[in-house]
């Protein structure tokens, strides 16, 4: 049996019009070939689908059942084609994004996440908070489509684009003598009790900020080690020490703490969008990348 979709469409048109001439006009074909195709369809099925007289065309019991089934099949095919097209256009599917805790504080990132969800509601956006080090392996393996992470050494198999190049800022308790200065030097910060990341956490900011200090031959006196940037902010506001974080965290404003610019011009950090170089990017991932890069312009 070799029934094609066009046979089903021909039959549905005749069954709905109950007139070969009108059905042929609807299908934009001539009537004789349409009659031949319906006869061939009946022969393949082995049942009469239409009762024909000189004056009318009626559905047989088999024809009524075949009409219902044909409509369902054609609807399923149309739905499947529409879903495939939406996936091809990046309007459906799944997008897996890793991000560091600082990424949502960057305006372009938060705006892009919001706009992407609005513009592509049928794309399942799976976000995973992971530090910089934790994202590398899933990106290489392709279990993450892309990652938002701090500048770090990347393997050759990963590509990146700079999302933001931002200053590092000092965080100082509000009643500290340095809190009201127009800026503060790294040397001044290195003399104070320092609240910082646990080295085992694997955040890119740990290497970034300590590397900056080392370039100036400074070693901060780390008195508190924690796992999250928000914990650092909380402990500084509680007066347990000073710290350094990227300027994007300035969106967190607490009365007990001041954000003070750092005097050294190279006190900067970058947020990167990273994706696998050798894995084909899904249309949804390409759309997200375009949205994010456009938000930076």
Curated annotation (Swiss-Prot):
Matching SUPFAM superfamilies, A to Z? Periplasmic binding protein-like II, Winged helix' DNA-binding domain
In this protein, which residues make up the domain named HTH lysR-type? 1-60
Which residue ranges carry the DNA-binding annotation? 20-40
Q: Which GO terms describe its cellular component?
A: protein-DNA complex
What are the protein's UniProt keywords? DNA-binding, Transcription, Transcription regulation
- Stored CDD domains: PBP2_LTTR_aromatics_like
Q: Which Gene3D superfamilies did the record assign? A: Periplasmic binding protein-like II, Winged helix-like DNA-binding domain superfamily/Winged helix DNA-binding domain
The processes (GO biological process) annotated in the record are:
regulation of DNA-templated transcription
What is the protein's name according to its record?
Uncharacterized HTH-type transcriptional regulator YnfL
Q: What is the lineage of its organism?
A: Bacteria, Pseudomonadati, Pseudomonadota, Gammaproteobacteria, Enterobacterales
